[in-house]
Design a protein with these regions (language model features):
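Glycine-rich phosphate-binding loops of nucleotide-dependent enzymes
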Residues: 2-249
Length: 249
């Protein structure tokens, strides 16, 4: 069975607080795996590390056998400062731990190319949007829908991440075909989560349970290999929880 996700010895510290302590886990293709723990145990922080929101204090994350997140070699970097000056790093480190010339060159090259990557561990580590493009999607513990958009448009916007339009296709007027295809796929996703009848309503007008399902549809719109659901049943009533459990299963 193919390994999709491997989390190796991940620790995440914020000052003196250890939010995640030496987490190791694997997810294989076709598996449903639950990360269980009480409130405040660090589940959301673990998801944030896996999806590139945080750079871990120690450990690494591999997705489809490729390392996508790993700690700074000193083990003392608590946070990535995306797109900022290397001085932001050296100010946090002792003089003997200042960034090497190789690291500075890598940062300058990234800035020159205006790459949407964060600088960490002398490599260009993918940001959350790049990790999503690699095939990993997630939902959030606190709902983060686009409030001013309809149910349909919330999913369509996410679908555009996979759009393959370019200058060549535009010149041949092929963009319209892709737009039609994506709109059809959005409708299929809304049917899958039982929201096709409210597709034209504003996302925030939906009951809480349906907003949760919309978040899942939006995540699925990116065509992920791996889908991370952060407490998907939080705040739901028993009926909504049962419906969601049946859907996930």
């Amino acid at each position: 069975m193919k390994n999709v996700l491997k989390v190796e010895n991940v620790t995440m510290q914020f000052g003196g607080v250890v939010a995640v302590d030496n987490l190791t886990m694997e997810v294989n293709e076709g598996e449903i795996v639950a990360l269980i723990g009480p409130n405040g145990a660090g589940k959301t922080t673990a998801f944030n590390v896996i999806t590139g929101v945080y750079a871990p204090t120690n450990g690494r994350v591999c997705f489809n056998e490729k390392c996508i997140v790993r700690n700074h070699p000193t083990g003392k970097m608590k946070k990535i400062y995306r797109g900022e000056d290397p001085a932001m790093y050296t100010a946090q480190l002792a003089p003997e731990e200042a960034l090497e010339d190789e690291a500075l060159k890598a940062w300058k090259q990234a800035q020159k190319e205006r790459d949407e990557y964060a600088f960490s561990d002398h490599i260009l580590a993918p940001t959350p949007d790049k990790i999503t493009a690699l095939g990993m999607a997630r939902t959030f513990q606190n709902i983060r829908l686009w409030k001013s958009q309809t149910v349909f448009d919330n999913v369509l916007i996410a679908k555009h991440l996979r759009r393959t339009s370019n200058l060549f296709t535009a010149a041949l007027h092929l963009n319209g075909k892709e737009e039609t295809r994506q709109r059809a796929e959005v409708l299929e996703l809304l049917k899958l989560v039982g929201l096709e009848d409210v597709k034209d309503e504003l996302a925030t007008s939906l009951p809480y349970g349906k907003q949760r399902r919309l978040e899942i549809a939006r995540a699925l719109a990116t065509d992920p290999t791996l889908l991370l659901l952060d407490e998907p049943a939080a705040g739901m009533n028993p009926q909504e929880t049962d419906e969601l459990t049946a859907f996930i299963g």
